[in-house]
């Protein structure tokens, strides 16, 4: 039979209902055979984890948008059962609250962490007359969909609408306009995960941080409020 000394689990599915119990059994079996397990995503499981600290990056993003004059926002979330989406949404709400800004409940919709679903969600918001000057997508895939939807709607980004994402996927700097986003240090996350696995196998202390800082990357998809037409002042 095949055997691995170390296993690294990644992805938001670590919290999917029905999957957690199966995952727990798998991890216990691996550890019973002397293997080491590390998690690289937000989770409530009792094993060592290294996770991206997106809260600080999201706070930077809000400071950036508020500094540009934005006060009315839409938020596109991921699936409710994914801890990644829940935590990012909470961080965004908290950062807005520090500026005395509350989200209009009508402006919070699920984009499913998917491009097409996010595009449809933005189109519905505009059709329903919900007012916002910036849309914050909780991952980059949804932001790509919003850029495509904005183009179909005749909204100029960023003159009429600012669009942001989270992750900093390689494609984001190639978009038109390039996407303002929060960079999640995936390469560093993987490297630290491997170091933690090896330290557990070798039974030595692991001294590196277990939460990795994320940073704001400002590109061309965000702009100052008031530059666009009334069509974009939503």
Predicted regions, residues:
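Bacterial carbohydrate/catabolite-sensing allosteric modules
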Residues: 3-8, 13-234
């Amino acid at each position: 039979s095949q055997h691995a000394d170390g296993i690294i689990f990644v992805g938001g599915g670590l919290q999917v209902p029905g999957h957690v119990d199966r995952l727990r059994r798998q991890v216990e079996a691996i550890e019973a055979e002397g293997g080491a397990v590390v998690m690289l995503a937000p989770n409530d499981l009792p094993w060592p984890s290294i996770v991206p600290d997106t809260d600080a990056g999201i706070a930077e993003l809000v400071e950036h948008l508020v500094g540009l004059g934005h006060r009315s926002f839409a938020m596109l979330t991921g699936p409710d059962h994914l801890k990644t989406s829940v935590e990012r949404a909470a961080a965004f709400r908290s950062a807005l609250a520090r500026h005395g800004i509350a989200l209009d409940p009508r402006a919070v919709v699920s984009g499913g962490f998917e491009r097409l679903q996010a595009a449809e969600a933005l189109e519905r918001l505009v059709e329903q007359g919900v007012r916002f000057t910036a849309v914050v997508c909780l991952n980059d895939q949804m932001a790509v969909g919003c850029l495509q939807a904005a183009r179909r709607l005749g909204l100029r980004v960023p003159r009429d609408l600012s669009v942001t994402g989270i992750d900093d996927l390689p494609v984001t700097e190639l978009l038109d306009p390039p996407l303002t986003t929060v960079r999640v240090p995936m390469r560093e996350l993987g490297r630290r995960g491997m170091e933690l696995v090896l330290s557990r196998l070798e039974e030595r202390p692991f001294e590196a941080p277990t939460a990795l800082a994320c940073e704001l990357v400002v590109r061309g998809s965000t702009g100052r409020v008031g530059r666009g037409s009334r069509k974009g002042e939503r």
